[in-house]
């Protein structure tokens, strides 16, 4: 499912116009992004938690040449699914 399809599904279930649902979805994504930029986690009880994780510097390997390559430290986004979501999928 892509973003426009998700917005359409929200519009139908919440009795909103597609434009309103799209604004709601964009606001939600903006808030999650902002919280992660501030190094906060976002927990949606039953659904899961979005959090920022730090990946330390490490040595990788160039797959074409086999030579070692230094990979800089970086931050990444992680998602830990909640119990209700895990149960719904299984």
Curated annotation (Swiss-Prot):
One GO location term (cellular component): cytosol
MF (Gene Ontology): DNA binding; structural constituent of chromatin
Keyword rRNA-binding listed: no
Protein task: Histone-like DNA-binding protein which is capable of wrapping DNA to stabilize it, and thus to prevent its denaturation under extreme environmental conditions.
Subunit structure: Heterodimer of an alpha and a beta chain.
Matches recorded under PANTHER family: DNA-BINDING PROTEIN HU, DNA-BINDING PROTEIN HU-BETA
Record protein name field: DNA-binding protein HU-alpha
Source lineage: Bacteria, Pseudomonadati, Pseudomonadota, Gammaproteobacteria, Pseudomonadales
């Amino acid at each position: 499912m892509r973003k426009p399809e998700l917005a359409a599904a929200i519009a139908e279930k919440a009795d909103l116009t597609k434009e309103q649902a799209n604004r709601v979805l964009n606001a939600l994504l903006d808030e999650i992004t902002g919280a992660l930029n501030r190094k906060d986690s976002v927990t949606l009880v039953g659904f899961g938690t979005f959090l920022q994780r730090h990946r330390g510097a490490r040595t990788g390997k160039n797959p074409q040449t086999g030579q070692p390559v230094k990979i800089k430290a970086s931050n990444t986004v992680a998602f830990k699914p909640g119990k209700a979501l895990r149960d719904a999928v299984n």
